[in-house]
């Protein structure tokens, strides 16, 4: 059963152009070609990268965040309340006012006290700035290293400057060790991101991030197996060119260097728009869609590969819209607003001031008159103006 599926899955017509077989890509006479089994090393490499990340965040990222002045906010802990906790975990984190009134009556609390409990309970689950800084600093280190390493690998290759050369003698293109190790490192890193996704800081575009990481892993796996390494390497380099800038923006933002953060974000926005909305469609998509089949007809891998690239481009457009909204706010107000993907800390003063304008529910169920808004409520600094990848690809 398994052998039959394996034989069907690796049919030449799925992976290779017409009239090309796997036999032509066997190593011979010192010529080495990519083989799908080479990628089995990516999983243990991902585990090694995870261990390196944990060590980096613990022994480098955390001390660095404190040295640079990144401080966690002091959060007021909620008083244990079984009824409210059960509703929070099973029914939702943001109950409507009728639900709040009912819960307040059940617990013998005022409406304002119940609102405050849910607000502080939500804040309790939000990640602290030092955790965000550690994650951003690890990704910054990897993306910058990967971009510099990839540029050094591809700088002297003809297809970096003329993407049409990706199809020169395709698929009979030999594998260079430097390109193999760079590709394997990228695949291992994205696998480690997928493994860590449930435990990392979650953004409002969490689903888009999951899709992006899965598409990236499938693209790298397919492109390596089908010897589409040349065009695949251009896709990787194009994404790495802006990702490290985004992570740098986050780090500076957590350090509260507003002017530096604004300047970096403008640079990142320009690089992101140019690489994802200009170079990617005009150089990558054009050559894979038109020039790749100039000498050979289309095949399943052609449609599959281009379909994944188009899905990646849709994610680029989605994140570009988020960036444009932030840029519009920047142009309007003169400083960068919080990242609209971020989960923002809620302050006690904001909702208490609003609640003071409406009657409050008392313990006995009677409505009380409006109370003056508190003037000494703690004001939490808005955290997380900028986030991760991608706003990426990735």
Swiss-Prot record:
Give ranges for the Lumenal compartment: 1-31
Q: Where is this region: Disordered?
A: 341-394
Q: Which UniProt keywords apply?
A: Endoplasmic reticulum, Glycoprotein, Lipid biosynthesis, Lipid metabolism, Membrane, Phosphoprotein, Transferase, Transmembrane, Transmembrane helix
PTM note: Phosphorylated at the C-terminus by CK2.
Q: Which SMART domains match?
A: TLC
Q: What class of enzyme is it?
A: transferase
Q: What is this protein called?
A: Ceramide synthase 4
> Can you name the source organism?
Homo sapiens (Human)
Kindly list the organism's lineage: Eukaryota, Metazoa, Chordata, Craniata, Vertebrata
């Amino acid at each position: 059963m398994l052998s039959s599926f394996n034989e069907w899955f690796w049919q030449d017509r799925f992976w290779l152009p017409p009239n090309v077989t796997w036999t032509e890509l066997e190593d011979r006479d010192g010529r080495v070609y990519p083989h799908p089994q080479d990628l089995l090393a990516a999983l243990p490499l991902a585990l090694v990268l995870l261990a390196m990340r944990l060590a980096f965040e613990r022994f480098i990222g955390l001390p660095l965040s404190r040295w640079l002045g990144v401080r966690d906010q002091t959060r007021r802990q909620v008083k244990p309340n079984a009824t409210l906790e059960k509703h929070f975990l099973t029914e939702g984190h943001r109950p409507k006012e009728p639900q709040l009134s009912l819960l307040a009556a059940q617990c013998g609390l005022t409406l304002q006290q119940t609102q405050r409990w849910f607000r502080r309970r939500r804040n309790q689950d939000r990640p602290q700035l030092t955790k965000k800084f550690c994650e951003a600093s690890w990704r910054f280190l990897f993306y910058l290293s990967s971009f510099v390493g990839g540029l050094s690998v591809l700088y002297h290759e003809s297809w970096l400057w003329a993407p049409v050369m990706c199809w020169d003698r395709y698929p009979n293109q030999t594998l260079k060790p430097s390109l193999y190790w760079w590709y394997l490192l990228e695949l291992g890193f994205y696998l480690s991101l997928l493994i860590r996704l449930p435990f990392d800081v979650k953004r409002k575009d969490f689903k888009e991030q999951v899709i992006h990481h899965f598409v990236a892993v499938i693209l790298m796996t397919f492109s390596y197996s089908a010897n589409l390494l040349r065009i695949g390497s251009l896709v990787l380099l194009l994404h790495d060119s802006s990702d490290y800038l985004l992570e740098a923006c986050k780090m500076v933002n957590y350090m509260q260097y507003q002017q530096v953060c604004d300047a970096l974000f403008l640079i990142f926005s320009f690089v992101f728009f140019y690489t994802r909305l200009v170079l990617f469609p005009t150089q990558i998509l054009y050559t894979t869609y038109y020039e790749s089949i100039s000498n050979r007809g289309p095949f399943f891998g052609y449609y599959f590969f281009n379909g994944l690239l188009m899905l990646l481009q849709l994610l680029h457009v989605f994140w570009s819209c988020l960036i444009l909204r932030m840029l519009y706010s920047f142009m309007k107000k003169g400083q960068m607003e919080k990242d609209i993907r971020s989960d923002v800390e809620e302050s006690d003063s904001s909702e208490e001031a609003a609640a003071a304008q409406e009657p409050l529910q008392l313990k006995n169920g009677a409505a009380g008159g409006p109370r003056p808004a508190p003037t000494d409520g703690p004001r939490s600094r808005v955290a997380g103006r900028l986030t991760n990848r991608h706003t990426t690809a990735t």
